[in-house]
């Protein structure tokens, strides 16, 4: 085990600063005002060892331990305890009672865990799910809160830990979930990379009294690293709550950010939009966001207009543009790949839409261009833009696949040697001078370099080909969202042997009567059709207006476009206009 592993640093912090606050969890499900519980470093370490002792009774080194627990301090103990026991932790969400959670079932089948860790509150739902006829034998269930977590912790250490600390199962927006094997070395390397960029003006170190604020789910890579791993690696206090707590009242997030000490957080694009729409002046009266060090914006496409609205909304509360840090990353690279330098505010550059659809990037005036955010020039990890067919680097201004190389890149996918070779074993042909040797990670994301800055246009597998031209669904969706405000899926479907554009749009109707509602739908249809034609030169074959929650998504909120196509083909969407 590396001296800088999560486990060794946890042990060190428990010894050097035993009574300092480590993790604070605010439970808003039991009380609307919130019930707060805090663990010190020594308490976290003790719980980790107690859980590890119990896990070790059912596991040998390298066995998988799946965590199916609600957000909370018990989840943290389960995750750390699994690794301390020499098992490979597998963080997941809790399956719903009476429902078939395909993702959880797929992961259980792939990981073949020897033990399940949960809590007494959801043990029934977990047991119901894992004991179904088609589910493989997955070992016993441990209820974390039923253990004596305040007693003496047993003294033991596993000498030879597995190479993988945990399996981060991908969202599966384009395929079945695959377990990315993340090592302690990956975690330490990626933490150093992101800290060097986010805090480059502070020599890669945040102020010692920094509080990391997060409501992101622990089973998602950004929530796991931000909420559990980064506080241990950096020695920072973490203030946590659940995704539901944020969705119910986004102002809770803002109050945690304004706790008086320097704070750091992260959120996907929709969270910034929701905070703008659902936060009233009364919710945040007297709030001061001046101590916010930064908020990472990632996990999904970052919309420039959303960030502008967020900054404008909270500017009276001392929030500044340079506090938002649009970032690019993926689970296969542990989490982080690129963002602009510390102190830089988000930069939006406009490019000719027609050129983008042919694979070129030409800057233009804002009135006629497609807005894209800059992610700076990545230095660590190393990034190249590559033609995915020839494996030759693309010149600046040419769209290609983003390839990544660095100690943060994972070893591969669990039990998937063919996919591992394809995704993690890419080799450059005729690499440019100064390019490191060895294999590269194919991200599946398309981007380009322009004036020494990287821009991202979308996923290769999501690209729409309509009338023989390439279009990026995120661009079309962004155009529509400026009108509707809700989730949008742009898909292409075959009609009479030709691919046609279909947009699925989630709407919450505001009309008081059926007649007013239909009039509202007609106005939206006309506005959306005109905007897509004007901005992208496309005709829409069908506008599918549906209630909120209709568009299938991954656990991290990414649109499952292939599933959208299938639902559309089978006429499974419930249309608001009949």
Swiss-Prot record:
The keyword Lipid metabolism applies. Keywords: Fatty acid metabolism, Isopeptide bond, Ligase, Lipid metabolism, Ubl conjugation. It comes from Mycobacterium tuberculosis (strain ATCC 25618 / H37Rv). Pfam families: AMP-binding, AMP-dom_DIP2-like. Belongs to the ATP-dependent AMP-binding enzyme family. InterPro entries: AMP-bd_C, AMP-bd_C_sf, AMP-dep_synth/lig_dom, ANL_N_sf, FAAL/FAAC, FAAL_FadD21. Gene3D superfamilies: 3.30.300.30, N-terminal domain of ligase-like (3.40.50.12780). It is an enzyme of class 6 (ligase). This is Putative fatty-acid--CoA ligase FadD21. PANTHER family: DISCO-INTERACTING PROTEIN 2, DISCO-INTERACTING PROTEIN 2 DIP2 -RELATED. It comes from the Bacteria. CDD domains: FAAL. The keyword Ubl conjugation applies. GO terms for cellular component: plasma membrane. There is a cross-link at residue 355 (Isoglutamyl lysine isopeptide (Lys-Gln) (interchain with Q-Cter in protein Pup)). Disruption phenotype: Disruption results in the complete loss of diacyltrehalose (DAT) and polyacyltrehalose (PAT) biosynthesis. GO terms for biological process: Actinobacterium-type cell wall biogenesis; fatty acid biosynthetic process. Its EC number is 6.2.1.-. GO terms for molecular function: adenylyltransferase activity; ligase activity.
């Amino acid at each position: 085990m590396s001296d800088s592993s999560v486990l060794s640093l946890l042990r060190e912090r428990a010894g050097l600063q035993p009574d300092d606050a480590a993790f604070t969890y605010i439970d808003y499900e039991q009380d609307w005002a919130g019930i707060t519980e805090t663990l010190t470093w020594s308490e976290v370490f003790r719980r980790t060892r107690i859980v590890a002792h119990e896990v070790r009774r059912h596991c040998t080194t390298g066995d998988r331990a799946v965590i199916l627990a609600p957000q909370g301090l018990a989840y943290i103990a389960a995750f750390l305890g699994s690794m301390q026991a020499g098992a490979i932790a597998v963080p997941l969400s809790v399956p719903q009672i009476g429902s078939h959670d395909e993702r959880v079932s797929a992961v259980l089948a792939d990981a073949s865990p020897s033990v399940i860790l949960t809590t007494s509150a959801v043990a029934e739902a977990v047991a119901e799910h894992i004991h179904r006829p088609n589910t493989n034998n997955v070992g016993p269930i441990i209820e974390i809160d039923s253990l004596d977590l305040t007693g003496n912790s047993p003294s033991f250490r596993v000498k030879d830990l597995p190479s993988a600390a945990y399996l981060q199962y991908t969202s599966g927006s384009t395929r079945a979930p695959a377990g990315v094997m993340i090592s302690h070395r990956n975690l330490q390397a990626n933490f150093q990379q992101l800290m060097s960029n986010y805090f480059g003006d502070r020599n890669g170190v945040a102020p010692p009294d920094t509080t990391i604020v997060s409501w992101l789910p622990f089973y998602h890579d950004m929530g796991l690293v931000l909420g559990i791993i980064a506080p241990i690696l950096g020695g920072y206090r973490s203030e946590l709550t659940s995704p539901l707590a944020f969705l119910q009242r986004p102002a809770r997030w803002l109050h945690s950010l304004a706790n008086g000490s320097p704070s750091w957080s992260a959120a996907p694009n929709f969270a910034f939009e929701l905070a703008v729409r659902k936060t009233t002046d009364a919710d945040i009266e007297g709030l001061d966001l001046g101590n916010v060090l930064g908020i990472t914006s990632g996990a999904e496409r970052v919309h420039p207009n959303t960030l502008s609205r967020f900054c404008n909304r909270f500017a009276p509360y001392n929030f500044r543009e340079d506090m938002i840090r649009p970032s690019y990353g993926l689970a296969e690279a542990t989490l982080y790949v690129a963002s602009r330098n510390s102190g830089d505010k988000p930069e939006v550059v406009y490019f000719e839409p027609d050129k983008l659809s042919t694979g070129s990037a030409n800057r233009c005036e804002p009135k006629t261009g497609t807005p894209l955010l800059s992610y700076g020039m990545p230095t660590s990890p190393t990034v190249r833009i590559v033609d995915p067919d020839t494996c030759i680097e693309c010149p600046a201004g040419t769209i290609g696949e983003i390839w990544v190389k660095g100690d943060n890149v994972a070893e591969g996918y669990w039990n998937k040697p063919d996919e591992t070779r394809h995704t993690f074993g890419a080799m450059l042909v005729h690499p440019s001078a100064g390019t490191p040797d060895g294999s590269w990670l194919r991200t599946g994301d398309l981007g380009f370099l322009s004036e020494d800055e990287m821009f991202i246009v979308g996923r290769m597998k999501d690209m729409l080909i309509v009338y023989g031209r390439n279009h990026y669904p995120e661009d079309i969706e962004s155009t529509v969202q400026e009108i509707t405000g809700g989730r949008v899926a742009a898909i292409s479907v075959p009609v009479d042997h030709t691919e046609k554009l279909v947009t699925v749009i989630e709407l919450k109707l505001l009309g008081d009567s059926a007649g007013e509602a239909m009039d509202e739908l007609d106005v939206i249809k006309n506005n959306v059709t005109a905007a897509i034609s004007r901005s992208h030169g496309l005709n829409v074959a069908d506008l599918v207006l549906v209630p909120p929650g209709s568009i299938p998504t991954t656990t991290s909120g990414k649109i499952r476009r292939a599933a959208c196509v299938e639902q559309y083909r089978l006429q499974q969407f419930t249309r608001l206009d009949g």
